[in-house]
Amino acid sequence: MQCTVLLLDIFTRNGFIVMTIQMGKNLESSGNNICAARIHKYGSPLELDDIRKPTISSPEEVIVRVGATGLCHSDLHLINGDWQKRLPVSLPKTPGHEVAGWVEEIGASVPKNSIKEGDLVAVFGGWGCGHCIYCKRGDEQICQSAKWPGLSEYDGGFSEYLLVPSYKFLVRVDGRATSLKPEELAPLTDAGLTPYRAIKKVRHLLGPNKNVAIIGIGGLGFYGVQYAQILGSGANVLAIDRSDDKLELAKGVGADFTLNIAMLEGIRKKIDIITHGQGVDVVLDTVGLEITLDTAVNILNRNGAIVVVGLFGREIKAPLFQTVIKEFQIQGSLWGNYNELCEVIELAKKTKIKHQIKKFSLSKVN
């Protein structure tokens, strides 16, 4: 069996990366074996392995033929061994939780009107228990028993096929109603979903004459700028980063103002000029370092909100006096739920969301 004919899509421009794996048209499996890129040792390159194709053992299960799988920083944390204590998994492990593809096989109890073989689907990655209060209210991704593909005992999508524990975790994308491709859908399941939920949490604070800042224009920030425009009801969108090239990307998707934090001695002074002394009403921190939170607090308006989605740091520190006196709100936001993924895909169908993708072979995955 030849594994190297898979394609790896990557969007990279001066350090901004969104990766997807797309199966090549000429890939041929041998028997019941499939190809997967797996972690054998933390901090080491992924290895291309021949493994057994997953089989259905439960009536709700579905096998998806992978069309594309995104690589986000959570995967890199896993591959590098940064999360051995937070998310212990048995090795070897196939990473990849941003997955889109086609239904290959369905279990016996999957309703016929839900999905069928051949359907294009996006895989929702928060596989909750379905019974707890969080799952019942629709927030499966924060279920205490949630399993994530590639980040739990379930293997992920750096493979030809993915076993999904229930059809309920699949969003069917009607091919007749959209020109979306798997490589466009895959990043939406996390990189495109996480900032959407975060902005939705605080959209009541936005509107005309309001200001929202996106700190960190990587994969999450790239989408975050777009959602701030879509959901902000006329609010000014400020993009903050250390790279002029990334800030140019932000301008291209709707940022009204850009600030290179590396070149500013007093960012609050610049913010005051832009906002006429008000400060920023909402900050989306896609980085999650102490320095970015300090920046967020420094530029925040009274009664403003900071939503943290980045996981680069280890702890959050906030000034108690300012937080109380100015009624700051500081909250975390994890991923997004199934219904929010459906909303994101609908926006993508209407071409409200921009994508940038390149391709190269899986043999260059490392």
Give the residues covered by each predicted segment:
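NAD(P)H dinucleotide-binding glycine-rich loop of Rossmann-like/cofactor-binding domains
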Residues: 129-215
